[in-house]
């Protein structure tokens, strides 16, 4: 790290502002007017004027201060030492470190220095400097070479970058050349008025002094843009702290952006409590009997991390006296299969007697000798699905409770037979009418044929 010039000895005219420096070079042009629109600029831009003749350089500063200081280490203050440390305090409003003093870009003093402008900004400045506000590609090359000598010895790839920016960037558009103009091959390029302001803002935000070391990104030069953000403004440029940098002993948190989001630590105790809460809510839903498919709304923030499916909302908790625990995904089909097996093992009368029980008998749960043989009564399944069976009875016919074979062999009731007979009779009646109509049409067709044949003869 080289010697540092104190801020008190620093020259006042370290650079020129956008509205003053560039406007002197492009006096009376639209480019200078565009840059003078905003007066809130707090950073200078380089002086890119290249005038002929000898000129006294006013940018150089007297170096007598360097000889006055015997011990250079004493000139390093606390702010300089803190700029080296990776652990920073972004809330400290300390001034910028003099270690990274803002030296203006001067093409005359250091022609081999790369200009800190993007190619879109270079194209924008070249087009805005032209009187007609439109230039061909070769004139853009000439303008860049004239004002930035760095590109004279630079690799030829920068011309490809200029062409790519012209063709791919929406800020530039191709215009037709006039007949009076003789520009040779190529097209004219101009600035799209819709995106002109974007280019001006990009030019104003361009850092005119690139950081010499990566420490510039970690130096404390001002508070963050918003609380908890990783961006901070330094020397008029928006910089970002590296994600790996630890600040104040912890990584950067964006609580300022998302005030409602807060980290919830998940511990084994919390997971156990969540499981207990879910079991309790399941039992409460069993007692209150909510409608099927209704969403579960909880005001407890601990229960926000629990989820309930449509199947679990219809589940019922097993009674303590039952031998087996039924899963939440049990449906009416499982009940029918279970009933079929019970009827095959026992007698048909036992199952029908179980279906014919009244509600008081089901509530009292007094097992009869026939119920003792029933598998539903033994497993406690009936006590678990009382209300489901009650609703199923209203929409079931007696034949639904029988096995599949007996449903096929069972005769339909008399009312169904009468309806089927009436339907068959109506169909036969319609078929008879249609056959009669067909016979009549056939007879008429034959008669007409015979008449035609006799007429021909």
UniProtKB/Swiss-Prot annotation:
Residues 1-24, 86-109, 285-422 are annotated as: Disordered. InterPro entries: FH_FOXN3, Fork_head_dom, FOXN2/3-like, TF_fork_head_CS_1, TF_fork_head_CS_2, WH-like_DNA-bd_sf, WH_DNA-bd_sf. Its main location: nucleus. The modification Phosphoserine is found at residues 83, 85, 97, 415. The keyword Disulfide bond does not apply. One of its GO terms (biological process) is craniofacial suture morphogenesis. Residues 384-396 have a biased composition (Basic residues). It is found in: Nucleus. Keywords: Cell cycle, DNA-binding, Nucleus, Phosphoprotein, Repressor, Transcription, Transcription regulation. PANTHER family: FORKHEAD BOX PROTEIN N3 (PTHR13962:SF20), FORKHEAD BOX PROTEIN N3-LIKE PROTEIN-RELATED (PTHR13962). Interacts through its C-terminus with the C-terminus of SNW1/SKIP. Acts as a transcriptional repressor. May be involved in DNA damage-inducible cell cycle arrests (checkpoints). This is Forkhead box protein N3.
């Amino acid at each position: 790290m080289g010697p540092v010039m104190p801020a008190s000895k620093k020259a006042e005219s370290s650079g020129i502002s956008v509205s003053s420096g560039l406007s002197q070079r492009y006096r009376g042009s639209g480019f200078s007017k565009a840059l003078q629109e905003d007066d809130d600029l707090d950073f200078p831009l380089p002086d890119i004027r290249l005038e002929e003749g000898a000129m006294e350089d006013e940018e150089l500063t007297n170096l007598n201060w360097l000889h006055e200081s015997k011990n250079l280490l004493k000139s390093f203050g606390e702010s300089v030492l803190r700029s080296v440390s990776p652990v920073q305090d972004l809330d400290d409003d300390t001034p910028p470190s003099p270690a990274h003093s803002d030296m203006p870009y001067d093409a005359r003093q250091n022609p081999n220095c790369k200009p800190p402008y993007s190619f879109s900004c270079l194209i924008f400045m070249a087009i805005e400097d032209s009187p007609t506000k439109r230039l061909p590609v070769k004139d853009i090359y000439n303008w860049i070479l004239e004002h930035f000598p760095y590109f004279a010895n630079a690799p030829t790839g920068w011309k490809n970058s200029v062409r790519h920016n012209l063709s791919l960037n929406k800020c530039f558009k191709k215009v037709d050349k006039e007949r009076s103009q003789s520009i040779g091959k190529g097209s004219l390029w101009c600035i799209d008025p819709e995106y002109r302001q974007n280019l001006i803002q990009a030019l104003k935000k361009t850092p005119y002094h690139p950081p010499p070391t990566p420490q510039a990104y970690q130096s404390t030069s001002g508070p963050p843009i918003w609380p908890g953000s990783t961006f901070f403004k330094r020397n008029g440029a928006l910089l970002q702290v590296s994600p790996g940098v630890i600040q104040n002993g912890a990584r950067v948190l964006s609580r300022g952006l998302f005030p409602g989001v807060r980290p919830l630590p998940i511990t084994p105790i919390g997971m156990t409590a969540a499981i207990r809460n879910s079991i309790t809510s399941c039992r409460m839903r069993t007692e209150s009997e909510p409608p099927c498919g209704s969403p579960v709304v909880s005001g407890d923030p601990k229960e926000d991390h629990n989820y309930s499916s449509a199947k679990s909302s219809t589940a019922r908790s097993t009674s303590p006296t039952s031998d087996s625990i039924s899963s939440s995904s049990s449906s009416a089909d499982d009940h029918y299969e279970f009933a079929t097996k019970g009827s095959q093992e026992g007698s048909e009368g036992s199952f029908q007697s179980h279906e014919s029980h009244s509600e008081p008998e089901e509530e009292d749960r007094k097992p009869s000798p026939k119920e003792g043989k029933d598998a539903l009564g033994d497993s406690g399944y009936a006590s678990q699905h009382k209300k489901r069976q009650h609703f199923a009875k209203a929409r079931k016919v007696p034949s639904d409770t029988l096995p599949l074979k007996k449903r096929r062999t069972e005769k339909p009731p008399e009312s169904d037979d009468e309806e089927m007979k009436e339907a068959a009779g109506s169909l036969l009646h319609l078929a008879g009418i249609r056959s009669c109509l067909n016979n009549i049409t056939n007879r008429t067709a034959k008669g007409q044929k015979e008449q035609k044949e006799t007429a021909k003869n």
